[in-house]
Amino acid sequence: MPKRTDIQKIMVIGSGPIIIGQAAEFDYAGTQACLSLKEEGYEVVLVNSNPATIMTDKEIADKVYIEPITLEFVTRILRKEGPDALLPTLGGQTGLNMAMELSKNGILDELGVELLGTKLSAIDQAEDRDLFKQLMEELEQPIPESEIVNTVEEAVAFAATIGYPVIVRPAFTLGGTGGGMCANEKELREITENGLKLSPVTQCLIERSIAGFKEIEYEVMRDSADNALVVCNMENFDPVGIHTGDSIVFAPAQTMSDYENQMLRDASLSIIRALKIEGGCNVQLALDPNSFKYYVIEVNPRVSRSSALASKATGYPIAKLAAKIAVGLTLDEVINPVTGSTYAMFEPALDYVVAKIPRFPFDKFEKGERRLGTQMKATGEVMAIGRNIEESLLKACRSLEIGVHHNEIPELAAVSDDALIEKVVKAQDDRLFYVSEAIRRGYTPEEIAELTKIDIFYLDKLLHIFEIEQELGAHPQDLEVLKTAKLNGFSDRKIAELWGTTDDKVRQLRLENKIVPVYKMVDTCAAEFDSETPYFYSTYGWENESIRSDKESVLVLGSGPIRIGQGVEFDYATVHSVKAIQAAGYEAIIMNSNPETVSTDFSVSDKLYFEPLTFEDVMNVIDLEQPKGVIVQFGGQTAINLAEPLAKAGVTILGTQVADLDRAEDRDLFEQALKELDIPQPPGQTATNEEEAALAARKIGFPVLVRPSYVLGGRAMEIVENEEDLRSYMRTAVKASPDHPVLVDSYIVGQECEVDAISDGKNVLIPGIMEHIERAGVHSGDSMAVYPPQTLSQKVQETIADYTKRLAIGLHCLGMMNIQFVIKDEKVYVIEVNPRASRTVPFLSKVTNIPMAQVATKLILGQSLSELGYQNGLYPESTRVHIKAPVFSFTKLAKVDSLLGPEMKSTGEVMGSDATLEKALYKAFEASYLHLPTFGNVVFTIADDAKEEALNLARRFQNIGYGILATEGTAAFFASHGLQAQPVGKIGDDDKDIPSFVRKGRIQAIINTVGTKRTADEDGEQIRRSAIEHGVPLFTALDTANAMLKVLESRSFVTEAI
């Protein structure tokens, strides 16, 4: 069927900010879909609140609205644009829920907007647990016994009839939010209560637990002519019971018989046909390992995390084709862009194995609950491709960037047998490493399979890896054993360890004996047809398929998996850098390991290497491609950390040189540079042990800010008030980087701001200054940033511009740099300099219309700012006000404290733009799901050093009609200054404490600060947790509360008697 001509204008809803459960895979899907629709000649209107994505670039759609994805704003845009149709299946759960809301409020009918891709009835059938159950019964597809409940009592009654364990699944939530496994009534009551609150329709499904079954997923496509196919099947290494987003996954599935595969394939295709989905869909099934029994677990009637993985694993571009199907094209009319010759109706065939391992945030959240269950906790993931399980698994392990280069964590050797087995049975994020350690200790695959329900097939592979380790240990320098190890994915580093030599020597031995990897193409058809995709993975074998071209090339290193502190912003910069390299006439080569992102879409670069970002793997590509040089500025700390070893190996680093990177990152060299340039910084010293740190702090005076050098996202950074706290920090936190010292700085409480600058070595372009709303002490990634600055004097802005120019030229910066300043009493101090692209690049690029990463890349490749038409100095300000606000994923992470400080905790960001500060703030708060009603109750629980300031806020809240509640000490302070606040009880005073008020819905906002001492106040933590769990806006910085008040004041009317 040809494409539809009765629709011209299509609106696409994006997925909003990155949170756990909804990450960069939707940026990738949305970008593909918008371009795909434009290619077919439709006018595309995009709504998305996330500035950090490629998707919200001007070129991606005809009109891009970076506005909150709320009923109010989306309706406004629909009325203004009047599209013929809406495509909601590419914006994750956010997009689907928005479509449902628009429909239920009658907006779609009123404006005559048609839903494309998935009909509302199908969204309802897949997402509403009751309708889903009915549909499965009609199709005679087995599902676990279950009951829909709307109250806790109903749940308890049903569980009593089927017996424990049971699983709770809230309706219409993302990434299993609010769900979980319950072994008894107490757990069931707790989880159901929370799940009902988090479900927008207060509905949960209670079902019999089938934990221990194999979890299998099918990624399927269907078109309007009822053609349907399986793109890819995938098998979870972890059995049912752990969220698939937190599971290690292999594609294609490895342990099913042909009969089982056909059975589950038929089930998946019959489900997508029954739902009449036009586009992509993901079906999750549970298979009994001991019989042919299976159950359908759930269906996602949209593009999902698994479809991004399936696209990258097969090369089959699901989102791109889903968009074409949505406008009426059929699978037998669309050419598969990978081969360029076969139609999309061909099912992909794989002649390799793909492994995906999730990346968790627990290196940042040491207190977080690491046990895995049905609620997702990973922030990102890595993927690796190999010719066997061992190879793809070990490549994926070293892609994780958690300090491992093999499937082992050396520290586990010291763990007792009992502790080890407990971790093997009770899965945490690092279970793979515990299971591998158990095998090294002689536990058999059979014993471990019994304990974990992991298939023996995979455990045998882990045993095989261990056997190769033993072979290597017994035969140092043996070439045959070396070949075997390389065929099975071993790194040079691991081999060197077992041989008692260095990585370099192993590399030399390999090169002398021509033991080098070949690169194979990902072509969707197992090499049956000729293919034109330049998408490669390494393996040790025969016939290299990646042929070096005659054109000069430039290699760009990506940023690896998404984690807190290094998010999709770096992928954004990578993609823009590639565009500039191509525009300059070079061949652009990308190397990255993250399946969710736009940079690993094979159509972005001239060549894509899907490989771990380690020195060995990068050098292998360089040896083959011989590029003009490597760009490391855009891949965050991942790429910067590779600069020095690459330069030592004789590789040309393009842009700022390694010695100059060192001057910005090494404390003593940086201090010296600032002295020479006559730029003030807070007084500080370096310390390599506890005594030195104590001495330094006494000299500088408390409070001090302590942190390791060379880290990203404020890892292990703290503000300490006294020597005792400092000593305990030195004992517990300094593991962060053993061969780098700790920095001890005077902590200046002032106004913080940051600048991104671009330099060609002679001139410096400063696109803009961003002012932080929260004062110094809150990590820049967790602060709200305002552009242009609202409170900085002209003099301060001129000083900042002057210091920025001096630093860029003085540090020989070529390309991008980011500088953070703190201002106190009109004096400007430099806090830190990062000689690379930072996380503010996408935001600042969008609000100034300067494609910063592209400009920086052109300068790196030899052009000057004046040739590109840019002046030296500060770029003219925009007239609108733009705000970048952080978004957190605390609902997903039990036991993580939501108190903000110098260590970064946010997972994503949104942007609000308007003519005034108040309007822009309103949009930013709405987009980040912080909705405050115009009246209600606010509770204050404030540390002594901030009571004075809080009093002023409380008065303003009272003026606009809010009721004021406060904890005992705060209420007494308010009363002594003439403000009566209703006192609330201490934690544990039943019915009178803050958590119980929160549960009853009597509190609309909580303002909670702790002293600079920041001791773990358990009461405060419980209060903050209750706010997170019940979705009550929580402010742990008074500056943020002040910003929210500005919004409320601008929206409220004053009523006064005459």
Swiss-Prot record:
Positions of Mg(2+) 4 binding: 832, 834
PROSITE patterns: ATP_GRASP, CPSASE_1, CPSASE_2, MGS
Residues engaged in binding ATP 2: 707, 746, 748, 752, 777-780, 820, 832
Residue ranges annotated for the MGS-like domain, each copy included: 930-1058
UniProt keyword Repeat, yes or no: yes
Pathway assignment: Amino-acid biosynthesis; L-arginine biosynthesis; carbamoyl phosphate from bicarbonate: step 1/1; Pyrimidine metabolism; UMP biosynthesis via de novo pathway; (S)-dihydroorotate from bicarbonate: step 1/3
EC number(s) given by UniProt: 6.3.4.16, 6.3.5.5
Binding locations of Mn(2+) 2: 298, 300
GO biological process, one term: L-arginine biosynthetic process
Entry-linked CDD domains: MGS_CPS_II
Matches recorded under InterPro entries: ATP-grasp, ATP_grasp_subdomain_1, CarbamoylP_synth_lsu, CarbamoylP_synth_lsu_oligo, CarbamoylP_synth_lsu_oligo_sf, CbamoylP_synth_lsu-like_ATP-bd, CbamoylP_synth_lsu_CPSase_dom, MGS-like_dom
EC main group: ligase
Limits of the ATP-grasp domain: 133-327, 671-861
Residues engaged in binding Mn(2+) 4: 832, 834
Pfam families named among the record's database cross-references: CPSase_L_D2 (PF02786), CPSase_L_D3 (PF02787), MGS (PF02142)
The keyword Magnesium belongs to this UniProt entry's keyword annotation: yes
Residues that bind Mn(2+) 3: 820, 832
SMART domains cross-referenced by the UniProt entry: CPSase_L_D3, GARS_A, MGS
Region Carbamoyl phosphate synthetic domain, annotated ranges: 547-929
Binding positions for Mg(2+) 1 per the UniProt entry: 284, 298
Free-text note on domains in this protein's UniProt record: The large subunit is composed of 2 ATP-grasp domains that are involved in binding the 2 ATP molecules needed for carbamoyl phosphate synthesis. The N-terminal ATP-grasp domain (referred to as the carboxyphosphate synthetic component) catalyzes the ATP-dependent phosphorylation of hydrogencarbonate to carboxyphosphate and the subsequent nucleophilic attack by ammonia to form a carbamate intermediate.
Family classification: Belongs to the CarB family.
Protein name: Carbamoyl phosphate synthase large chain
Lineage per the UniProt record: Bacteria, Bacillati, Bacillota, Bacilli, Lactobacillales
